């Protein structure tokens, strides 16, 4: 989800799409004939595929994510710490990231050891699941463009 009011939106958007497509990522944009309904928002792609849409503000992004997300991990890329804090506190995901890749949502990376499974449920544990996770947790991860290879 991209804020419609972002500075230099057209140039940054075109650069993003070109970069993704050059890496072999299929870019899906609602409303341009690629998707017939809102059902695509519920789909987990499990492929080099991304869904891009625009929102008016962070509140709309939070609402969209909380409506359609599976609750595993969610990230925001912004230099505005207030916006990031609001996003991270309001998004209903097991792990929330500010300027870091969601690929860090892994048992070894989160310090719980080898994963037995992944849970997005709120009863007992959400996120990477190890033997000691018997309470609900929400992980807050802050970065500066960090990725995981």
Briefly describe each language-model feature range.
Residues 79-149:
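C-terminal segments
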Residues 1-101:
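NAD(P)-dependent aldehyde/semialdehyde dehydrogenase
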């Amino acid at each position: 989800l991209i804020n419609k009011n972002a500075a230099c939106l057209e140039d940054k958007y075109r650069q993003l799409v070109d970069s993704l497509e050059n890496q072999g990522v299929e870019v899906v944009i609602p409303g341009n004939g690629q998707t017939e309904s809102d059902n695509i928002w519920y789909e987990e792609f499990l492929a080099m595929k991304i869904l891009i849409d625009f929102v008016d503000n962070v509140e709309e992004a939070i609402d969209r994510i909380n409506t359609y997300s599976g609750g595993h991990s969610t990230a925001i890329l912004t230099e505005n710490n207030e916006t990031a804090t609001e996003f991270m506190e309001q998004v209903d995901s097991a792990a929330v990231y500010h300027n870091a890749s969601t690929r860090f949502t892994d048992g070894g990376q989160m310090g719980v050891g080898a994963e037995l499974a992944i849970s997005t449920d709120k009863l007992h544990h959400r996120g990477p699941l190890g033997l000691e996770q018997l309470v609900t947790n929400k992980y807050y991860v802050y970065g500066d463009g960090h990725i995981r290879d």
